[in-house]
């Protein structure tokens, strides 16, 4: 039986174009080595299109039975099956060569090849991504995307305990470093033998291009500095974003802000995120135009969006880089006490920007979301951050992806919403259920709006209401609210430019 599983994995590699006929025996022997099997007989017959997840599970179960896994749990299974996938992988240099050959024909052909490879290699686990729950909700700002992320596996208690005991290794320095390519992983760091990177030169420095293993949206890519330098928003950031867009005009690219609370989860390594997807924010129109002295040729305006976003457009990206630097410098030093905007308190800076670049037709576009990370006694997690009334759905930072209109909600919500829907249909008291109690005030608020609620439509209603909460979260993160007062304070800043 195990011979059949091994042959199926090699057949999968052939079908995916990872392994050619010439590589078949080599790949088989590599798998035998990883499986610690010395005897092999080619099976008579195997399926034409073996399923990868099923085949790996057969191999993993066998390895676990024979004591090759420290524990038979997801962390150790992932470390082991990545070692198996490595047996099918082309060398990093071959991948880069193929990418460059295709790029000479068209950038999109090159990214198509690389994206497919990143999935075929199981670096992106398609069968896990398929578990993510996604929907979209209409709002005053356009259709907002919501997702409950289930593709990051929950660690089991044994792995968590082992990770605590494991000595802290400084290699690779972090999950983004180029040293991850081919790294075997450990209990507190994923295996990356099946991971490949394309080197790029942007702003005359060496950067790497890869896909995110968790694919929050189509062709979700990460562009990262080959040096482990911290995140920084500055003129060079805008240069690098546009250098990337000139290389891959079919992609957008953006950067997280460089301050805690309003930044992303990794501030220690300079990186950007991009992809082949049109977010609600990119579709949102300019609601009010402005002319900025010295930049009369640049189309400038405030975007109709819950966060405070300035959009600038021009056919020459150098004009946008100059203006973006001007806006960034003005915003970093800007205080307006009436609007509760403070550039700094006690020497700690608060103002920064989340920038997003794209090309529309022959015009370059740069969206600058104004961010401020001030905290107060009433809002210890941040004034322009999800407020406490929404924490039952989302309390994490609002980073780049959320700024653009895609909610990435915690996995716990899947079970909580299912439980909640049962309670609502049966008319039970939500407050009486320990893990649902946190949702009770929210339920009290929206239930009166839905007399039509029944077992057929309850989940749709919950999804719609979660969407409204996320819009509220984005409004919380906006420095200038979408009210007459907020918009006139925003205009006041625009006039200072």
What are these regions (language model features)?
Residues 209, 253, 270-272:
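Hydrophobic faces of well-ordered beta-strands that scaffold small-molecule active sites
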Residues 194-196, 228-253:
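Helical scaffold of the NTase/Pol beta-like nucleotidyltransferase catalytic core
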Residues 218-225, 263-279, 367:
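Histidine-centered divalent-metal-coordination microenvironment in nucleic-acid enzymes
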Residues 1-223, 227-230, 304-306, 320-324, ...:
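Active-site microenvironments that recognize anionic phosphate/pyrophosphate groups
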Residues 236, 245-265, 274-326, 332-335:
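Catalytic or ion-translocation cores adjacent to nucleophile or general acid/base/metal-coordination motifs
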Residues 260-268, 346-352:
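Beta-rich nucleic-acid/ligand-interaction surfaces
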